[in-house]
Swiss-Prot record:
InterPro entries: F-box-like_dom_sf, F-box_dom. Residues 7-51 form the F-box domain. SUPFAM superfamilies: F-box domain. This is Uncharacterized F-box protein ZK328.6.
């Protein structure tokens, strides 16, 4: 019988009572309590499977293993050194098959074979994960090759995939190969791409090394404090050349330059978001957005063909009665109405948020965004302009 101090713990208490007791303890304590007996192990592991559907693994800068469970969000946050294989093996043993959402880095997935996981040869490591947030910082040649060799055994079917890339000029090609492997393996997933870099040149070079892919969202984030320039015409050119289509585009912490003669996108956009940016030329940005909206096209990019009206004639038949032949019935004309397909809005929404500087309208101070809204709604009537989240520091 298990003893704790001078008190004796009776392991054959009803399951309901044990669950009430286990609810009072956090994750590290429960991991110790599961060693009491097999029955306690089964109850605690069942509790973990119900309460942990998301895992976040952070292995950068951690000196010793830590685990924190957030029960309301059904999340388990792990921070541990890169060589904590036994610690991670215990975490996966308890609740690996209950994970539906995962946040981790490319180095962890590339070295997953070093962690002991009890599974069949034909099973995936995380067969129930549907949402993956993957961090890529230093995908060198060794990490890339190990990941490409094992990526087919990681997940069954991803529905949501977010790739956060900290751009490094030495790894342009490796990032492109990793992204390509995800596209080929999970063609039906919604892909979000985040690119973090100090200079726009690194962003553009990384995009030029990506394969052709449809994105739900692309987010370009500047990590330099001085807000270097990002030319929207150059971004348009490289995305068009690589055939990279994104439904939503977000810019953050850049100094944006628009030439006024190039659209901001060559494919239809749901949202174009400018967050905490300095807009160098407001007039040219308005012109570029107007050019983008003027690219409105029909469904599938082809105007609907005119269809001829279909007239169906009812067959004429003579009805003979005792009184003679009845008059022929009138002809029924059926007209098929063909509705014209409405053109698709090429850009539906523009969002301006955060601490933005609108050069050319700064004399209006805190009313600058209202003038931007007025110009855009005048030139592009169907555009939804949202500046509700903008703020000023003066």
């Amino acid at each position: 019988m298990y003893t704790c101090g001078n008190r004796k713990v009776i392991p054959n208490m009803p399951d309901l009572i044990l669950r009430k007791i286990f609810d009072q303890y956090d994750y590290p304590v429960l991991c110790k309590m599961e060693r009491v007996c097999r029955r306690w192990t089964n109850i605690i592991n069942s509790k973990f499977r119900k309460e942990i559907h998301e895992i976040s693994i952070e292995r950068l800068g951690s000196m010793f293993p830590q685990a924190h469970q957030c029960v309301p969000f059904r999340r388990l946050s792990i921070s541990c050194p890169s060589d904590s294989h036994d610690f991670l093996a215990g975490v996966f043993r308890r609740s690996r098959l209950s994970f539906m959402k995962m946040t981790t880095d490319i180095n962890f997935l590339a070295g997953i074979d070093q962690i002991h996981v009890s599974k069949d040869n034909g099973r995936r490591y995380f067969s129930n994960v549907e949402d993956l947030w993957l961090l890529m910082i230093h995908p060198d040649d060794d990490v890339t090759q190990r990941f490409l060799a094992i990526e087919g055994t990681l997940f069954s079917e991803l529905q949501q995939l977010t790739l956060q890339v900290h751009v490094n000029p030495r790894y342009y090609k490796n990032v492109g190969e990793i992204v390509k492997s995800f596209i080929l393996r999970y063609p039906k997933s919604n892909i979000n791409l985040e690119l973090h870099a100090e200079k726009s040149m690194h962003i553009l070079n990384q995009i030029s090394n990506l394969p052709s892919l449809p994105l739900y969202k692309i987010k370009l984030i500047c990590t330099d404090f001085d807000q270097p320039q990002l030319r929207l015409d150059q971004l348009y050119a490289v995305m068009r050349e690589q055939n990279i289509q994104a439904k939503n585009i977000t810019m953050r912490d850049w100094s944006l330059f628009a030439d006024g003669t190039t659209p901001v996108s060559y494919n239809p956009l749901d949202t174009f978001r400018i967050s905490s940016c300095s807009i160098e030329t407001v007039d040219n940005l308005v012109k570029s957005i107007q050019m983008t909206a003027s690219q409105g096209t029909h469904v599938d990019g082809v105007p609907p063909t005119k269809k001829k009206k279909v007239i169906r004639k009812k067959k004429e038949t003579e009805v003979v009665t005792e009184e003679g032949v009845l008059p022929k019935p009138k002809k029924k004309v059926v007209k098929k109405v063909v509705k014209k397909k409405k053109p698709i809005a090429f850009i539906k929404k523009l969002e301006v948020a955060g601490q933005c500087t609108l050069h050319g309208l700064t004399f209006l101070q805190q009313k600058a965004h209202t003038e931007l809204e007025r110009r855009l709604t005048t030139l592009v009537p169907g555009l939804d302009v949202d500046c509700s989240e903008i703020y000023y520091c003066w």
